[in-house]
Amino acid sequence: MNEPVVKQHSMKFWLMALRPKTLTAAVVPVVVGSAVAAVQPEGWHPWISGFALLSTCFIQIATNFFNDALDFKKGADTAERLGPTRVTQAGLLTSRQVMWAGGFCLLLAFIFGVPLVVVGGLPIVVIGLVSLAMTYAYTGGPYPMAYRGLG
């Protein structure tokens, strides 16, 4: 079966890089946390769950973008690689485009995390900053977690 022809820089390429199936890793913890919050005496605040969901989804998407671009730069993604197409390795998007998109997603994650910091204080600041750093450290930096059995 032949793949349909797609125009250069199509939304389909960005959707492929986004890897929607991985978003369950961001959604499930927020849904579980929201369910736990719903039975607490303080009650559940939908807007907190909404900001948490947006922030975690953008962190996951940024991780996917960085992984795609950095694995290509390091030579980890080759034509022999099994699994879904990696847009950078396939030449559908440049590593620079995908890295910029990852950075933009981190900015969005930060913006959506600010209201959580206002409510949750210093613990949320620490969790947020570590999450933002680990997004890149998964496949970037001098000791990428993905190459050490940690990802």
Please give the residue ranges for each predicted region.
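Aspartate-rich (DDxxD/NDxxD/DxxxD) Mg2+/diphosphate-binding motifs
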Residues: 63-106, 146
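Topogenic membrane-insertion module of multi-pass membrane proteins
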Residues: 1-51
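Membrane-embedded alpha-helical segments that form the functional core of polytopic membrane enzymes
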Residues: 30-31, 41-67, 125-136
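Membrane-water interface at transmembrane helix exits
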Residues: 33, 37, 41, 67, ...
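Alpha-helical transmembrane segments of multi-pass integral membrane proteins
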Residues: 21, 51-52, 59, 98-102
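Intramembrane alpha-helical segments
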Residues: 90-151
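Short hydrophobic "helix-edge" motifs at membrane interfaces and signal-peptide entry regions
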Residues: 10-11, 54, 60-62, 84-85, ...
